């Protein structure tokens, strides 16, 4: 059996547990949120017995942000000192529906070149 470098990553399972735990916390907070944004502080330090803690931090933050974006959220992260804040925003369904209706109506507006024809039609009535 061949050994691959990726198999030597002892923190892989621990990283996945931390990712899942944070996503569960974020999901709970999102469900309780009344506004269309959430600010959530992520753990900034991970105490691993082996491996590179910065690499683990990068992998964890990447996976969390990727998961949220794949579910339709807009995510920004601010890292300053020993703090990492996620800014999560989303459009409410009502806003999305309004935008779709406005776009639909815009598609049906008479364009400048069409105005002359339709205005003549109105004047003839």
From Swiss-Prot:
Induction: Expressed in the late phase of the viral replicative cycle.
Keywords (A to Z) from UniProt: Late protein
Family statement drawn from the similarity comment of this UniProt entry: Belongs to the asfivirus B125R family.
Identification of the protein by name: Uncharacterized protein B125R
Organism: African swine fever virus (isolate Tick/Malawi/Lil 20-1/1983)
């Amino acid at each position: 059996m061949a050994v691959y470098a990726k198999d030597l990553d002892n923190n892989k399972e621990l990283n996945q547990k931390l990712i899942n735990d944070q996503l569960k916390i974020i999901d709970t907070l999102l469900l309780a949120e009344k506004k269309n944004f959430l600010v959530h502080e992520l753990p900034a330090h991970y105490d691993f017995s082996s491996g590179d803690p910065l690499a683990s931090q990068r992998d964890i933050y990447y996976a969390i942000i990727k998961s949220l974006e794949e579910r339709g959220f807009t995510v920004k992260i601010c890292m300053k000192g020993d703090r990492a804040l996620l800014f999560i925003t989303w459009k409410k369904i009502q806003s999305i529906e309004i935008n779709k209706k406005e776009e639909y109506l815009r598609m049906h507006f008479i364009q400048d070149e069409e105005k002359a024809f339709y205005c003549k039609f109105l004047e003839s009535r």
